[in-house]
Every structure is written in C-alpha cells, then in structure tokens.
Amino acid sequence: MVEPLLCGIVLGLVPVTIAGLFVTAYLQYLRGDLATY
C-alpha cells in the first residue's frame, strides 16, 4: 500500500527538484554574465 504512494511522491518531486536546480543555475549564469560585461 505504501510503495505506490512513495513512487508517486518521488516521481512528483524529482522533476520539480531538477527544474528548480536548472532555473537557479540559469539565473546565476545570467547574473554572472551581466556582471561580467
């Protein structure tokens, strides 16, 4: 009973976490790029 719920939570959190890290890295890249020039 617990495993499907756990799989659903993991499958829900993983894309959000990856998207959050990607957005954060992209914003830091833009900020660094603007600061460089």
From Swiss-Prot:
Compartment(s): Plastid, Chloroplast thylakoid membrane
Keyword annotations from UniProtKB, A to Z: Chloroplast, Electron transport, Membrane, Photosynthesis, Plastid, Thylakoid, Transmembrane, Transmembrane helix, Transport
Organism superkingdom: Eukaryota
One GO CC annotation: cytochrome b6f complex
TM annotation in the entry: 5-25
Gene Ontology MF: a single term: electron transporter, transferring electrons within cytochrome b6/f complex of photosystem II activity
Record bears the keyword Plastid: yes
Signal peptide feature range: none
Pfam family, one: PetG
GO BP, sorted A to Z: cytochrome complex assembly; photosynthesis
Protein topology in the membrane: Single-pass membrane protein
Cited NCBIfam families: PRK00665.1
Function: Component of the cytochrome b6-f complex, which mediates electron transfer between photosystem II (PSII) and photosystem I (PSI), cyclic electron flow around PSI, and state transitions. PetG is required for either the stability or assembly of the cytochrome b6-f complex.
Subunit structure: The 4 large subunits of the cytochrome b6-f complex are cytochrome b6, subunit IV (17 kDa polypeptide, PetD), cytochrome f and the Rieske protein, while the 4 small subunits are PetG, PetL, PetM and PetN. The complex functions as a dimer.
Family in the record: Belongs to the PetG family.
Protein name stated in the entry: Cytochrome b6-f complex subunit 5
